[in-house]
A protein has these predicted regions:
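Polar/charged, Gly/Pro-rich intrinsically disordered segments
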Residues: 19, 54-68, 179-194
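Short, intrinsically disordered low-complexity segments
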Residues: 32-111
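Alpha-helix boundary/N-cap detector
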Residues: 14-21, 63, 146, 150-153, ...
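Short, extreme N-terminal segment that most often corresponds to the first beta-strand
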Residues: 1-52
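Amphipathic N-proximal alpha-helical interface segments
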Residues: 102-103, 108-127
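Conserved short hydrophobic interaction patches
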Residues: 26-33, 78, 158-161, 165, ...
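Acidic, proline/glycine-rich low-complexity IDRs
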Residues: 120-194
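Short, hydrophobic beta-strand segments
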Residues: 5-11, 56-59, 69-73, 125-141
């Protein structure tokens, strides 16, 4: 069963007031794909995700965090959420041989009052890496182990880089169903080796 994979980051309490600056820093650190890719999208919502976006803008070519920052700064408030849907490079398996290609990623920043934020324990920053199968062993695909290992290393390197660069109080890498991704990965690795 495929599931969405997320990294949720909660900033130190005193850093929440500058969350947009930290989101811009996250964007500068993120390894966006430089390959040919579909459009990226920047979206800004107020109050909650059921409301129409205040802004939704398509962007062509590789994402440039420096070009996005002024757009984000035009919309500020505790009930604002910023979302960037873009691409990063992962090994992927289609009908042919594995290939390094752009994979969808969504990077988000949530104001403390967005979607009843703090009351619901909402994270400050989130990275949605798409389906977890890009990071899990695929025994039915011969030779996939080294490519999956490369994807997992890229993911872990990114997690540690974000933790080092941002004032993170707490982080959680999990699937949409709430399953702990590290536990699931470990179980599948044991089953693959056995």
């Amino acid at each position: 069963m495929t599931d969405q994979l997320y990294l949720s980051l909660w900033l130190n309490r005193h850093s929440r007031a500058t969350r947009l600056r930290h989101f811009e820093q996250l964007l500068k650190l993120f390894p966006f794909s430089q390959r040919d890719q579909p459009q990226s999208t920047v979206s800004i919502h107020a109050i909650d995700s059921t409301q129409p976006p205040l802004l939704e803008q398509a962007l062509n070519g590789p994402l440039d965090p420096e070009a996005i920052a002024p757009i984000l700064r035009d919309y500020q408030g505790d009930d604002i959420a910023y979302s960037i849907e873009s691409w990063w490079d992962l090994w992927q398996f289609g009908d042919s041989d594995p290939k390094l290609a752009p994979a969808r990623v969504t990077l988000s920043c949530f104001g403390p009052d967005f979607d009843d934020g703090l009351a619901s324990g909402h994270e400050d920053l989130r990275m949605d890496f798409g389906v977890d199968t890009n990071f899990l062993p695929q025994p039915e695909v011969p030779g996939s182990a080294k490519f999956i290992e490369s994807n997992v290393k890229s993911l872990l390197r990114l997690v540690h880089q974000m933790e080092s660069a941002l004032p993170v109080a707490h982080r959680k890498l999990e699937t949409e169903s709430g399953e702990n991704f590290a536990d699931r990965l470990q179980q599948l690795l044991k089953a693959t080796i056995a």
